[in-house]
């Protein structure tokens, strides 16, 4: 199962429904894998990070960012805020995390890699 959001709480509820439905169909929950696709921007200025996501969403999809955010998981802000955001989905059941990085990919990859042990605990 590979959804794109919208938030960790809803993802967790849907994850539980996914597992329950699979078990009722005779599937072993240990055989199920769940991923999540999230859009993040890491910047010290949270407002600037969120604005960069909005700009990206508008240019990529040609739709209002508020509409896209209503069903896509997005977070802009400090590395601590972004890690907490990602951890919410992991805690709710995501086995794999796919990140769309908005901004300087190399810098964000280094920041996330330096703290990777915190992401998937």
Give, region by region, the residue ranges found by the protein language model.
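Active-site-adjacent structural elements that line small-molecule/cofactor binding pockets in enzymes
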Residues: 1-121
């Amino acid at each position: 199962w590979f959804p794109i959001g919208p938030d960790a709480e809803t993802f967790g509820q849907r994850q539980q429904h996914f597992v329950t439905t699979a078990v009722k169909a005779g599937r072993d929950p240990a055989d199920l894998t769940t991923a999540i696709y999230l859009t993040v921007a890491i910047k010290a200025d949270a407002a600037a990070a969120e604005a960069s996501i909005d700009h990206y969403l508008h240019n990529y999809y040609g739709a209002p960012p508020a509409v896209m955010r209503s069903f896509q998981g997005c977070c802009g802000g400090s590395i601590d805020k972004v890690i907490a955001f990602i951890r919410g989905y992991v805690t709710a059941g995501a086995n794999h995390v796919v990140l769309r990085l908005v901004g300087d990919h190399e810098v964000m990859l280094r920041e996330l890699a330096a703290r990777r042990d915190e992401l998937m605990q």
